[in-house]
Design a protein with these regions (language model features):
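A conserved beta-strand->alpha-helix junction
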Residues: 1-3
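Metal-dependent de-N-acetylase/amidase catalytic core
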Residues: 7-164
Length: 164
């Protein structure tokens, strides 16, 4: 639809559901649902969430040609702290590897029109350093689960950010 013109439409959501069915991802990342951010971001987050639900349903006429697919986990990210969900504790992902930081920085720099308006790259790297310090690592990003995380055993829980 164009920058700042993305509308929540059933056609968009169904198309995204079709992509999820075709690609069969286990984990899907989407922009957070908080409205205190660019309108395209929260709208896309809502459509991805709804598409994940539609992808697992069998009854939609437009999706009948492909088998249903249920993702394992939907995680939201926020571009700015203002868009962080307030009622969900984040999962912190270690992104300290210099190759990851370089690729992430390059991906952010590709959004030239947006990084000119505000120094989003430095904002994200500063947030990553702060979250990393909180977790005792170099850099971390916060992801917010749509649903409770399920672990097969307590042994899979390696540590918390607090590191009691």
């Amino acid at each position: 639809d164009g920058d700042a013109h993305l509308e929540i439409r059933a056609a968009h959501t169904i198309k995204l559901a079709g992509i999820l069915r075709r690609e069969k991802p286990g984990v899907v990342l989407a922009p957070s649902l908080g409205e205190n951010q660019h309108p395209d971001h929260w709208r896309l987050g809502k459509m991805v969430r709804d598409a994940a639900r539609l992808a697992r349903y069998g009854g939609l006429k437009e999706l009948r040609r492909s088998p249903a697919h249920a993702i394992d986990q939907l995680l939201f990210y926020s571009v700015t702290p203002e868009a962080d969900p307030r009622d969900v504790s984040p999962v912190l992902i270690d992104v300290s590897d210099p190759e990851i930081i370089a690729a992430w920085t390059a991906a952010m720099a590709a959004h030239e029109s947006q990084v000119r308006a505000r120094n989003y790259i430095e904002l994200q790297l500063t947030r990553a350093r702060l979250l990393g310090a909180r977790a005792g690592i170099g850099h971390a990003i916060a992801l917010f689960p749509n649903d409770p995380l399920v672990f097969g055993s307590l042994a899979e829980l390696t540590r918390s950010a607090r590191r009691f």
